[in-house]
Amino acid sequence: MFSSSSRPSKEPLLFDIRLRNLDNDVLLIKGPPDEASSVLLSGTIVLSITEPIQIKSLALRLFGRLRLNIPTVLQTVHGPHKRYSKFERNIYSHFWDDFNIKSYFQNLYDNHNNGKITISSKSSTNLAALPKRKRALSTASLISSNGQTSASKNYHTLVKGNYEFPFSAIIPGSLVESVEGLPNAAVTYALEATIERPKQPDLICKKHLRVIRTLAIDAVELSETVSVDNSWPEKVDYTISIPTKAIAIGSSTMINILIVPILKGLKLGPVRISLVENSQYCGSYGGVINQERMVAKLKLKDPLKHVAQIKKKRSLNEAADEGVDTDTGEFQDKWEVRALLNIPASLTKCSQDCRILSNIKVRHKIKFTISLLNPDGHISELRAALPVQLFISPFVPVNVKTSDVIERTLKTFGPSYQVTSQHDNSFSSKNFVDDSEEDVIFQRSASALQLSSMPTIVSGSTLNINSTDAEATAVADTTMVTSLMVPPNYGNHVYDRVYGEVTNEDETSASASSSAVESQAIHNIQNLYISDSNNSNNPILAPNPQIKIEDDSLNNCDSRGDSVNNSNLNLVNSNLTISENWNNNSPSANRYNNIINAGLNSPSLTPSFAHLSRRNSYSRQTSSTSLKNDLELTDLSRVPSYDKAMKSDMIGEDLPPAYPEEELGVQENKKIELERPQILHHKSTSSLLPLPGSSKSSNNLKRSSSRTHLSHSPLPRNNSGSSVSLQQLARNNTDSSFNLNLSFTSAKSSTGSRHFPFNMTTSFTSNSSSKNNSHFDKTDSTSDANKPREEENYTSATHNRRSRSSSVRSNNSNSPLRQGTGSFANLMEMFTKRDRS
């Protein structure tokens, strides 16, 4: 019994809110606010206590808040100062009713009390002895600390144990999304559970919830190409384009620049590309505050080597001495530049495009600055911009702030002063967060490992567009990243190759065991790059742009085999290694080389038949260097921390359930025997003729006759009633007379056997005439004295049949049917006459 004392009660060991079916507490909404469907939010409130505690109520609510840190520049005596004012607004709230929790409390002690806690009151009646119906109808709680019922106190006592309180709610699809990456602005959601206790402080548990809105699979932005076409009069015509308007945070986009020079002697200089975020926010009063920040940037110092050519001319002073143009370079009618721009995978460095009510608006655009080197020496700049849309994709892992960092950052919002400078860009420096204090969301997606192993280009690095391998790698990576965001194009299913067509006709058939291993190895080898940027000095692994790989060329397979075999490619998913001792002339080696070369074809933006496969749009190739760094044995064997283990999960395919072998063995041994019901009306009597002298057949006939009263159950077949030829019956019957044992199954009769000779009229009813019965009684007494029994183990039914047959033979010794005993025609004629009579 919980006793009231001056000492404070112990705090619960565990008081937490756990959400179900959510990755890192992320509530994903697909589609725009006016089209998105509702989502289910469910979970449990977990409570673990070591001693009884008293609670009044348990409340749960979900609320969302918008917070702004609005700067205002003030002119003072000491100069301009920037003052920050806090703006806060509740944008969503949902309260769970306590009725379900109270009903849960009423049933707690039926499950957990076990009679350990008693109550003493004026009456000697214990609550445990009360009828169950009375306890259910009572609105009072359970136990009071002072020995009285808690009807007047209105609180509950929870005994030692673990408790789970489930909850669920339907969240509308128009819910405002979370914004955590903007400086001086934030939209956050939280679940708050409160346990109200008498005479003690309340217990409060908060759970940070992220509401992320992503694009629907049919969004136009995922397949819409954005481009700008314009001309600089008497200088250049240019076209700048990107494949899709929507770009996922943490992915990359390919930038295509096409310039047609008009002025003679014009050269291409450095190209600078930057991704700029423009955000606007305002409070209930004042104007709109604009702020910009650089999200990503890329600089191509000399994409076409024009700057190097000019420096070479100046070093030789050819233009200054001779005064003529001695340019021996090839004339180019157009300049093509391709660059891969990486978007940082962090919501602290950029935010998604959004519009939160009338308070926050975020947009992005890519700015281009192209330098043009004129013949007279001065530099002209071509500037352009493309609007893009950044969104959060569930297929790409993204770094986010932890809940502690978010709370710490929001506390800094409010009145503060800061001295402004000329280079101030309206950013509050106190809002920047260390990169080490970040968490990862969507890391359980199957593409997380693939994107982490993608070879990327660091911002600010130079892309050598003249290198064929660098260009092919950039194009391939962009195509692969884009395919993760865009749904598959089902119109291209005509290019699918049947798996059986991969093998060659000339190769010999391998064993079944080796073919399974080879198929797995082929799939793994296709996912590896031979070229390695870190091992470019190695002649084996160095990329060779002169080698052309084709599916139909067997010579290329042979020439490529040495470099592939000597590279000792370690397969990721299998323990197969291609060694140097592998014979290239063997059929297996040729098959491997063919598949390796087919998988290493440089993919392009348009599909070709050289590298078609049945891989879906989410599959992509990975580099061997990244896989080597990401899948080290030491990293895989390292035991993760508890928090990381709770937030991470193994990446793999769902497998069917594995059933115990014992149960399978028992089920296999139990064979279901299906019995065919016995035919009620037999068209032929040959199948019912028993073999003479068979005691087993008579026993079976008795067994079958005893089952005829079960009219609704299927009757088993009589195995002894097999077809017997008339010749065998003739051989067994020496007196040219036949004894037939016909079994007729009828609903009117419980007897299934009738005994009669061929030359007498049968009675198909169960009641025979008294005259026939007396006749058989007389003949039985005479025939038993004249004919001895052949076997001692004959049953009484067999004895009666033989005695009846002998009496009939004695009475019909002069019958004309005896003359044609073995004739089938005479037999049928006898049956016809018998039926007519």
From Swiss-Prot:
Q: Indicate the cross-link positions, Glycyl lysine isopeptide (Lys-Gly) (interchain with G-Cter in ubiquitin).
A: K401
A GO biological process of this protein is:
cellular response to glucose stimulus
Q: Where is the composition biased (Low complexity)?
A: 685-703, 763-773, 805-815
> Mostly located where?
membrane
Q: Where is the segment annotated Disordered?
A: 675-726, 763-837
Q: Name one GO cellular component term.
A: plasma membrane
Q: What more is known? A: Present with 386 molecules/cell in log phase SD medium.
Q: Which protein, by its recorded name, is this?
A: Protein ROD1
